[in-house]
Amino acid sequence: MFLGTHHPKLDDKGRLTLPAKFREALAGGLMVTKGQDHCLYVFPRAEFEQMARKVAEAPFTNESVRAYQRYLFAGTDEQQPDGQGRISIAAELRRYAGLTKECVVIGAINRLEIWNAERWQTYLDEHEEDYAQAREEVLPGVF
């Protein structure tokens, strides 16, 4: 399970060092893809393959399905962390997420999300009031 907030830096070669606590779960390979809200999603390879099978089951005769499949799979990059836990973020993915040196990596249960640090703070600021309402909708009576 991926949890927490981390602040690694993107180096000049477009590499990001994954938080040490996640490296074992990602040692078998990972997939980096465009996420929602202009962040990147990082899935363990097995998790992504399971999701991809579900996406592949959708009827490709449906134009929306084809469009989504193209968007998802064309924007996905397979990576293997190096000995120092670094992964290379493809230029197109860096552009999409607006990644600069300052990044934020958050745990989101079954995936990591990589954010531009300023965008992440803006997202938090803009959604703070929505959190209480969403909590009640997602987990009524739990908190």
UniProtKB/Swiss-Prot annotation:
CDD domains tied to this protein: MraZ_C, MraZ_N
GO biological process assignments: negative regulation of DNA-templated transcription initiation
Protein's UniProt name: Transcriptional regulator MraZ
Pfam family, one: MraZ
Domain SpoVT-AbrB residues, every copy: 5-47, 76-119
Superkingdom classification of source: Bacteria
GO molecular function, one term: transcription cis-regulatory region binding
Keyword Nucleotidyltransferase annotated: no
Protein family membership: Belongs to the MraZ family.
SUPFAM superfamilies named among the record's database cross-references: AbrB/MazE/MraZ-like
GO cellular component, one term: nucleoid
Entry keyword set: Cytoplasm, DNA-binding, Repeat, Transcription, Transcription regulation
Localization in the cell: Cytoplasm, Nucleoid
UniProt subunit comment: Forms oligomers.
InterPro entries, per the entry: MraZ, MraZ_C, MraZ_dom, MraZ_N, MraZ_sf, SpoVT-AbrB_dom, SpoVT-AbrB_sf
